[in-house]
Design a protein with these regions (language model features):
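Short linear functional motifs in flexible/disordered or boundary regions
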Residues: 25, 29-32, 36, 53, ...
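Arg/Lys-rich, positively charged N-terminal/basic patches that mediate binding to nucleic acids
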Residues: 1-40
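Enriched for short, Lys/Arg-rich terminal
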Residues: 28, 73-77, 81-105
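Basic/aromatic recognition patch in beta-strand/loop cores that engages polyanionic ligands
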Residues: 55-85
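Residue-level signal for beta-strand positions within conserved beta-sheet cores that form or flank
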Residues: 3, 66, 87-90
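Generic N-terminal leader/processing signal
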Residues: 2, 10, 68-69, 73, ...
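Short proline/glycine- and basic residue-enriched helix-capping loop/turn segments at helix->loop/beta transitions
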Residues: 49-50
């Protein structure tokens, strides 16, 4: 896939990813699953870069940003914002079981 858009991560998304990968690799003692998660995440980021509007539009009246999109990655939800300067902004990566994820669904 040839990338159309670049991407960047918010500090929150960086923290989400660090915590998720650490939890899977160390707490669950499954580094292969952590690596698989990263591979799936990178695939979905690449897909969003090529097709920025491919994720489902998040419909939430309490969300202050418009045009936030989401992609499902196994048991996780990746929230991102395609913007007008030809990049996507990865906002959040949440475990779907977390009640906080219900706010964004």
């Amino acid at each position: 896939m040839a990338s159309k858009f670049g991407y960047r991560l918010t500090k929150r998304a960086e923290s989400d990813l660090d915590g998720t990968v650490s939890y899977i690799a160390i707490d669950l003692a499954n580094p292969q699953a952590a690596s698989d998660f990263v591979d799936k995440l990178l695939y979905n980021i690449e897909e969003a870069r090529v097709f920025p509007e491919s994720g489902s539009l998040v419909d939430n009246e309490f969300l202050q940003l418009e045009n936030v999109r989401k992609k499902l990655i196994g048991n996780y939800i990746m929230y991102y914002l395609p913007n007008t300067v030809e990049n996507i902004i990865l906002i959040h990566v949440l475990y779907m079981v977390n009640k906080i994820s219900l706010i964004f669904i």
